[in-house]
Amino acid sequence: MATDPRKILVTCALPYANGSIHLGHMLEHIQADIWVRYQRLRGNDINFICADDAHGTPIMLKAQQMGITPEEMIAAVSEEHQKDFAGFDISFDNYHSTHSDENRELASSIYLELKKNGFITSRTISQLFDPEKEMFLPDRFVKGTCPKCKSEEQYGDNCDNCGETYSPTDLINPKSAVSGATPVMKDSEHFFFDLPQFESMLKEWTRSGSLQTETANKMQEWFESGLQQWDISRDAPYFGFEIPGETNKFFYVWLDAPIGYMGSFKNLCDKRDDLDFDEYWKLNSTTELYHFIGKDIVYFHSLFWPAMLDGAGFRKPNNVFVHGYVTVNGAKMSKSKGTFIKAGTYLNHLDPECLRYYYAAKLNSRIDDIDLNLEDFTQRVNSDVVNKIVNLASRNAGFITKRFDGKLSDNFVAPELYNEFVAASDRIAELYETREFSRAIREITALADKANQYIDEKAPWVLAKEEGKEQELQEVASVGINLFRVLMAYLKPVMPELAARTEAFLNETLTWECIAQPLTSHEITKFKALFNRIDPKKVEAMVEESKEDAAIEMAAKEKAEAEKEKANQTELDKEPIADEIEFDAFEAVDMRIARIISCEEIPKANKLLKFQLDIGGETRQVFSGIKSAYTPEELVGKHTVMVANLKPRKMKFGMSEGMILAAGPGGKDLWILEPHEGAQPGMRVM
């Protein structure tokens, strides 16, 4: 008896809206998409959503550096993110943003409900404050010397050199990473979510058996360490949502980020008549809710998020599926080595289905790191997908289309072998359901080996040359096509584009149920290449492009840092005071007040202006290199200061009888000295 379709809501962690998607992000989104596509293939009612995490200090500051608004920046990033995900066939039903009306309303209502129920407290805390930018500094925006190993330029929460963790106030010689100023301590009222009140509920949820063992064990460690109240507020200036009823107080990004799951789903519900938001999020909902996340954000998703939902009267997730990190060639992704590969860079060179297959061949239900070994990646995809699976179709299709007008045999001559393939469906289904994708791939490729063994033994290429073997040739080739059909039905969640091309070739939609019986007396279309081998040169080109991108990015970063450092320099930093002189040397310089009688440009002189100066009973001619800063009309009639006893200097355009004093670095940034009213031409400057 058929069961009703399951109603399932699936989310991926929200990518932060201040950078590009890379192959580390893609592990999670591919893992989730394979699971979602499998559920759709089995007829379940599933909705797959995501959004950009679009709030926080880093976004605010990066937008300032770019000279645009945060809204403009996150809109551009969202467009890039969605393009990359579409390029990898991630089949979201909705992709939204945490900076949305839906999310603002939900975050505010959840906060107010938590406050009403007694789960929000407030107290005054002391934080580091940037006196120049007039902003409180998050840990990562304070730099200084590590208190343990004394390494310089370390962040305010941990040392990259020795691994020590500490408070920003423990840093030696702390500096604001925003302005370079020395931060000061300043008090501010902050709001806290009272997480310890939910300890019993969280322990019960942990013991329910639905969480991964590693996650449950980690939560037990946190329980033993003691749960702490969670600071959910930030002070202005901040890019985010203001806390209802407060002034210049904003929700911390990690409060409204997970609520972004709800906001994205609410946005989807508003677009469709067949979805009810409350059905999926109400307390005791019978629908299923699953979050796919990386192991770096387990703390938020296994403690704060379910506690917030519970405290505000919503349902909790059925499970949080956690995966490990991605390494490349056995090491952390490296920009200098070209192994920090952006999704867009990958798509410039390689088929996204290659990565989907390779990740699937490595993924399991545990929190294991996945290594993308580029040499193994090439060999694995070429060996499994091209040589074993697609080759089944290419080896047999030509015989059917050329010799039998594209029609498969009326008889199926290998029922036992076919039944063995079909019998694997329950095992493979269970492996997909439990996210044991690598084991599912091993099952599928083992079947592919058996199919190729059958074709090798029957040798249709030999039968094609023998008279009277036409029927046997058609039957053998038809078996090969049918076995390929079963394999592609099993691979459809992993390689949807290859499956779509296969469906066009077979002239049939691949479903989990259709493979129960082989195709007989069925017409297929002319075979076209379904999948191309990975060319190692394209992999190399991808790595080289990643290196070039990293070099450009580093150069831009260094330029920005140099400009920032220059902007933070004092005038004495830029030009230190000259060596000391004796008073007699200073007294020898005769500076006088001068009135500018006339000023004119000199033909063919790029920098010089020609002056006639009244110094109280005497007129001097002076040439001065301030043409880039002033027009002659601006200067006539002004009083200024000149060195009157400088030895006259013969120049190309005439004799210069002194020097006008000006301040500034040069170019347009020059200012002549102008004395106060009352100073008369000829007066000596003392």
From Swiss-Prot:
ATP binds at residue 335. Its cofactor is Zn(2+). GO terms for molecular function: ATP binding; metal ion binding; methionine-tRNA ligase activity; tRNA binding. It is an enzyme of class 6 (ligase). InterPro entries: aa-tRNA-synth_I_CS, Anticodon_Met, Met-tRNA-synth_bsu_C, Met-tRNA_ligase_1, Met-tRNA_synth, Methionyl/Leucyl_tRNA_Synth, MetRS_core, MetRS_Zn. It comes from the Bacteria. It is found in: Cytoplasm. Residues 585-686 form the tRNA-binding domain. The keyword RNA-binding applies. The gene is metG. This is Methionine--tRNA ligase. Binds 1 zinc ion per subunit. NCBIfam families: metG (TIGR00398), metG_C_term (TIGR00399), PRK00133.1 (NF001100). GO terms for biological process: methionyl-tRNA aminoacylation. GO terms for cellular component: cytosol. CDD domains: Anticodon_Ia_Met, MetRS_core, tRNA_bind_EcMetRS_like.
